[in-house]
UniProtKB/Swiss-Prot annotation:
This is Phenylalanine--tRNA ligase alpha subunit. CDD domains: PheRS_alpha_core. Belongs to the class-II aminoacyl-tRNA synthetase family. Phe-tRNA synthetase alpha subunit type 1 subfamily. Tetramer of two alpha and two beta subunits. The gene is pheS. One of its GO terms (molecular function) is tRNA binding. The lineage of its organism: Bacteria, Pseudomonadati, Chlamydiota, Chlamydiia, Chlamydiales. It is an enzyme of class 6 (ligase). Its cofactor is Mg(2+).
């Protein structure tokens, strides 16, 4: 076998050895086998001494070329193996952030007002109403004029309403959704509108400058007052999980005719308490048949269509459902109080 054949055989064996080397230790063993002090290429160096001087240059060049090939392959293969080992080591040391910490973090919960608000909206959605919202900052037109409030109505006065400028207010009710939606949607319309409201009132156990309200309104052909009272009875039955006694009293609201106040029997069962002011009843909603003027302002013919609207305070419902006597507790951020409902 010539020296060239020996070198070719060495290259083939080397390629096989390198392909089987999957770690730095394996590669080191291959390097020692071929390039070590007692390695294969050391043997070729010993053979070179036996060649005539005129052949040494040619044979030596062939040996060096093969040796250089081995060194280059070992270098490239070494880089790949090292990168693989570093990646594996990184994965071993990686912190599993999905594991729980040494202490469990306390989870929050829905505020009682948010909880009641969601419950109310869910009931109306089950009744076929669509949820719509409107801005807290509203034009006087949408908050009052389109809802049949006269220019000199007391609700428009500074002592009852927060004015941002002469024509812009913080909405006093979520009825601004009604004026907006009736202007852009033609009957049939069934909408429930949740949100915050603002009124310039004294803060007490029963009233606050900021409160939450849900308005629901329906406009279609042949809507009657009995549809309204049936809706109210069905809603309170589901909300409280029992049949409740309701009382309807005639009342005046500019945007409905006739208008009613809706009272619910107090949990004191007529015995009298601070919540109901010893009356045995609690006012929970205002409602009525949508005034023809409101329909006309929305370009809806009151001779063809009719509708009802109702608005209820969420704080009042929460107070009734959970036996809370002071509306101020909802905004005082007392965790001892709030955690009872989370």
């Amino acid at each position: 076998m010539t020296i060239q054949e020996e070198l070719e055989a060495v290259k083939q064996q080397f390629s096989c050895d390198v392909s089987l080397a999957h770690s730095s230790k394996d590669l080191f063993d291959v390097k020692v086998k071929y390039l070590g002090k007692k390695g294969i290429f050391r043997g070729f160096a010993d053979q070179l001494r036996k060649y005539p001087i005129e052949q040494k240059a040619t044979v030596g060049a062939s040996i060096n070329a093969c040796k250089q090939y081995v060194e280059e392959v070992l270098l490239e293969r070494g880089k790949a193996v090292l990168a693989k080992e570093e990646a594996e080591e990184f994965l071993k040391e990686k912190i599993d952030i999905s594991l729980p910490g040494s202490e469990e973090a306390a989870l929050g919960g829905k505020h009682v007002i948010k909880k009641v608000l969601d419950d109310v909206v869910d009931i109306f959605v089950r009744f076929g109403f669509c949820v719509r919202e409107a801005p807290n900052i509203e034009s006087e037109k949408n908050n009052f004029s389109l809802l049949n409030f006269e220019e000199d109505h007391p609700a428009r006065q500074m002592q009852d309403t927060f004015y941002l400028d002469p024509t812009t207010v913080l909405r006093t009710h979520t009825s601004n959704v009604q004026s907006r939606e009736l202007a852009r949607n033609k009957p049939p319309v069934r909408i429930v509108a949740p949100g915050e409201c603002f009124r310039n009132e004294d803060v007490s156990a029963r009233s606050h400058v900021i409160f939450h309200q849900v308005e629901a309104f329906c406009v279609d052909k042949d809507i009657s007052f009995s549809d309204l009272t049936s809706m109210l009875a069905g809603f309170y039955h589901i909300f409280f999980g029992r049949k409740v006694e309701l009382r309807f009293r005639h009342s005046y609201f500019p945007f409905v005719e006739p208008g009613i106040e809706v009272d619910i029997s107090c949990e004191c069962h007529g015995a009298g308490c601070s919540l109901c002011k010893h009356a045995g009843w609690l006012e929970v909603a205002g409602a009525g048949m949508i005034h023809p003027n409101v329909l006309r302002k929305a370009s809806i013919d009151p001779e063809e269509y009719s509708g009802y609207a109702l608005g209820m305070g969420i704080e009042r419902l929460a107070m009734l459902k959970y036996g809370i006597s002071d509306i101020r507790l909802f905004s005082e951020n007392d965790l001892r109080f709030l955690r009872q409902f989370s």
